[in-house]
C-alpha cells in the first residue's frame, strides 16, 4: 500500500482543521444551550399588576397620578442582545422609559440592535394598566435563533422604578415551553435618586447600576418600599406566557386593546396584607414650666403622626408627654 504524499496529508489535515473550526463556531458560548425546536412558536403574554394598597400600604399613590403601570415593551432576541440586566448600567433609551415612560429612544435602540447584529427577531407591546391591579396582554413570536424574551414595565408614579424580565428562554432543548410564569419585583434603574413614589427629579450622578428594591434596601425609612418587618416584599406583579397552538405564519403585531375595568383584580382573599407600623416625629422641645411658685409645676412636649398604621401594624404611641418641673421666674 502506497504512503500518502506530503501534499495529500497536508490537504487532509487542513480539511480536518476546517471541519473542527466550523463545528466549534456552531457551538454555544459560555454554556449557552442550543435550541433545536421547531422554527417558530407564538405565545400570549399576560402582565398582571398586584400593586394594591393592602399589599403595599406605605405611601400608596391615590391621586396625581394614582398607582398604575406604563405600557409593556419587550423583544424576542438572541443572547447577543440585552435590554436590561441586574448590576449593569441601563441604556439612554431604558433610562427615558424608566423615568418618564417614553419608549421612542428604547424602540430605536432595539431596532438598531436588530439591524446591526441580527439579534432581535420581533418587538412586542401591550397597553398600559390604569390602576395598580389589573391586566394587559399581547402576542409575541420567537424562533430558534431568537428564543429569549425580555420586557419592561414602568411603575407609575416613581423616580425610575420598573419591573420586567431579562432574557427568559422559551426554548427547552428540542421543544418550546408550553408555559412560563414569573413573579415580578421592583427594580431601580440607577438614574434617579428619588426615595418615594412622588419624589421630584433628582438625577443620580454618576449613574448607578440596576438594583433590586427590597423590603430593607434601600435601608432608609423614607423609601416607599421600606418594610423592616418583612423578610421579602410580596410580588408587585406577575407575568404569564402561554404557547398558542397555531400554525407558524408571518407575525403580525396585535392591535392594542385598552384594558377595561373588567380586568381589575378584585379577589382580595389572595392579596397579602402587609403590616404598616405607625411612624411618629421626634419630640418637640419642652414647653414652659407652669405652676405656682414654691410648688412643683408641669411642662409638656408633643410629637405628631407621620404614617398612620395599617393592616394590623404597630399602633401609634402617646403623642404628648408631661414632666414635673420647677416654675421659672417666680416673684
From Swiss-Prot:
Span of domain TSP type-1: 277-331
Subcellular localization, as worded in the UniProt entry: Secreted, Extracellular space, Extracellular matrix
Span of the signal peptide: 1-26
Pfam families: Spond_N, TSP1_spondin
Domain Spondin span(s) in chain numbering: 31-221
Gene: SPON2
InterPro entries listed in its UniProt record: Spondin/Thrombospondin_T1 (IPR051418), Spondin_N (IPR009465), Spondin_N_sf (IPR038678), TSP1_rpt (IPR000884), TSP1_rpt_sf (IPR036383), TSP1_spondin_dom (IPR044004)
Residues annotated to bind a divalent metal cation: 141
SMART domains: TSP1
Coiled coil feature spans: none
Transmembrane segments: none
Keywords for this protein: Calcium, Cell adhesion, Disulfide bond, Extracellular matrix, Glycoprotein, Immunity, Innate immunity, Metal-binding, Secreted, Signal
Organism: Homo sapiens (Human)
Protein name from the UniProt record: Spondin-2
PANTHER family, per database record: SPONDIN (PTHR11311), SPONDIN-2 (PTHR11311:SF15)
GO CC annotations, alphabetized: extracellular exosome; extracellular matrix
GO biological process, one term: defense response to virus
Positions of Ca(2+) binding: 160, 188, 192
Amino acid at each position: 500500500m502506497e504512503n500518502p504524499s506530503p501534499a495529500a496529508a497536508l490537504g487532509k489535515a487542513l480539511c480536518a482543521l476546517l471541519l473542527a473550526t466550523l463545528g466549534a463556531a456552531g457551538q454555544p458560548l459560555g454554556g449557552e444551550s442550543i435550541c433545536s425546536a421547531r422554527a417558530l412558536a407564538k405565545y400570549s403574554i399576560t402582565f398582571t399588576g398586584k400593586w394594591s394598597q393592602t399589599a403595599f400600604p406605605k405611601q400608596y399613590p391615590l391621586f396625581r397620578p394614582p398607582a398604575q403601570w406604563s405600557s409593556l415593551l419587550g423583544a424576542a432576541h438572541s443572547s447577543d442582545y440585552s435590554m436590561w440586566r441586574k448590576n449593569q448600567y441601563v441604556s439612554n433609551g431604558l433610562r427615558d422609559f424608566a423615568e418618564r415612560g417614553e419608549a421612542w429612544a428604547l424602540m430605536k435602540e432595539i431596532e438598531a440592535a436588530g439591524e446591526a447584529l441580527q439579534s432581535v427577531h420581533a418587538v412586542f407591546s401591550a397597553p398600559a394598566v390604569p390602576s395598580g391591579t389589573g391586566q394587559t396582554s399581547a402576542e409575541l413570536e420567537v424562533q430558534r435563533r431568537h428564543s429569549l424574551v425580555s420586557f419592561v414595565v414602568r411603575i407609575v408614579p416613581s423616580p425610575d422604578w420598573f419591573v420586567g424580565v431579562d432574557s427568559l428562554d422559551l426554548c427547552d432543548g428540542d421543544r418550546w415551553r408550553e408555559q412560563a410564569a414569573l413573579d415580578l419585583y421592583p427594580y431601580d434603574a440607577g438614574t434617579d435618586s428619588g426615595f418615594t413614589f412622588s419624589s421630584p427629579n433628582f438625577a443620580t450622578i454618576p449613574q448607578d447600576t440596576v438594583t433590586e428594591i427590597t423590603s430593607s434596601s434601600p435601608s432608609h425609612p423614607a423609601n416607599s418600599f421600606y418594610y423592616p418587618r418583612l423578610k421579602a416584599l410580596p410580588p408587585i406583579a406577575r407575568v404569564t406566557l402561554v404557547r398558542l397552538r397555531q400554525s407558524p405564519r408571518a407575525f403580525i403585531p396585535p392591535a392594542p386593546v385598552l384594558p377595561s375595568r373588567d380586568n381589575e383584580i378584585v379577589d382580595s382573599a389572595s392579596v397579602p396584607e402587609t403590616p404598616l407600623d405607625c411612624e411618629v416625629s421626634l419630640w418637640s422641645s419642652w414647653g414652659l414650666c407652669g405652676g405656682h411658685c414654691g410648688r412643683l409645676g408641669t411642662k409638656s412636649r408633643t410629637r405628631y403622626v407621620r404614617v398612620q398604621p395599617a393592616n394590623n401594624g404597630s399602633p401609634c404611641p402617646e403623642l404628648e408627654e408631661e414632666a414635673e418641673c420647677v416654675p421659672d421666674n417666680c416673684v
